[in-house]
């Protein structure tokens, strides 16, 4: 993924990176539609679900850290179409999604120092009032 992003940047483009992952953060597209996160305990510090969530979010960090060394920015578009309800990150509702997004942004920016990411929130057309998802 990062080599393709670097190649695109070298040709004058700005790479976009999406992340289709299951709620375990290690599986792929089919699992993002079928798996679930334990929302009740995922944001409770010290729980097993919280540890799994933090480890899962960090799973993409080593790959993303390969970009800044070459001065490559990226349009980072995780958890898109969250308002549609067909992916695990949207089925937990708007409040949980916002907590997830903010946690990821905080970890990536402040804990891991990823400052080359341009954060993109990608809605579907399934919801008219998108304000709760911000």
Predicted stretch roles:
Residues 123-134:
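Substrate-binding cleft/loops of secretory-pathway carbohydrate-active enzymes
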